Amino acid sequence: MKSPFTTTVRAVVASIPKGKVATYGQVAALAGHPGAARAVGMVMRTNKDTKAVPCHRVVGSTGALTGYAYGDGVKSKKLMLEREGVTFKGDKIDLSTSGWKPMA
């Protein structure tokens, strides 16, 4: 059985649109737990349904790609994001253009 926190985090991540990313901290805040970025990382690490919960769309606070448990790891994560149209500046995501800005 999943905790209410896990269920909420998964729902937030499921709502990140293709071509956009959210930071771990942003997901934590949207889930009602500001400051719980590391806990969001734990939820993403145990995600088994990457189609319903696109954990590759969750990134570090600076736009840096962080761990990814599938395929070739971060290399696979970057390729998936590029295919979705996410823009990069060097090795980091350009959060000004590809950062998700959900409706308040």
Identify the residue ranges that each predicted region occupies.
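Nucleic acid-binding interface residues in structured DNA/RNA-binding domains
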Residues: 1-104
